[in-house]
């Protein structure tokens, strides 16, 4: 498989049905799911959200009742190195961090996830995605980019 062993292992553990395709960058990210890693005194948290949205950090802090800050690029590099990933993956639970998922992702029928490889993305359906996130916290903590553009023009 053209993706990291940890990705293959995680998908196999869940008996996930998925497709692999060549990655094409859009606005600097791969796939239609973005991720940001945060931390506070309780540890690290991975937030997954839709690629057409902007993360609202204040809403995320209210939702989680935590005082979160973004982890450093060096810490992200360390996470990727430990897992032999070329960049952060958006495949749920691979990073081994507490996970929160934006509601918009759960309303999507199919998702394209960053495999953590420079060259490939993973496509899964909503049911498979829900299986992968397990009992992760969910909520709304993003704003659609299109809503911001429309609001600023009015």
Predicted feature residues:
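Extended, low-hydrophobicity, polar/charged segments
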Residues: 1-154
């Amino acid at each position: 498989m053209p993706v990291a062993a940890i990705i293959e292992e995680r998908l196999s553990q869940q008996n996930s049905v998925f497709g692999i395709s060549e990655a094409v960058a859009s606005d600097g990210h791969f796939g239609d799911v973005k991720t940001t890693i945060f931390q506070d005194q309780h540890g690290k948290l991975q937030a997954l959200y839709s690629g057409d949205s902007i993360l609202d950090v204040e809403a995320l802090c209210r939702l989680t009742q935590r005082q979160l800050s973004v982890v450093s690029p060096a810490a992200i590099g360390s996470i990727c190195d430990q897992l032999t990933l070329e960049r952060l993956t958006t495949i749920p639970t691979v990073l081994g961090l507490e996970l929160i998922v934006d509601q918009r992702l759960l309303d999507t029928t199919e998702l394209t996830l960053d495999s953590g490889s420079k060259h490939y993305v993973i496509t899964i359906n909503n049911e498979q995605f829900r299986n992968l996130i397990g009992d992760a916290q969910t909520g709304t903590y993003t704003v659609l980019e299109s809503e911001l553009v429309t609001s600023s023009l009015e």
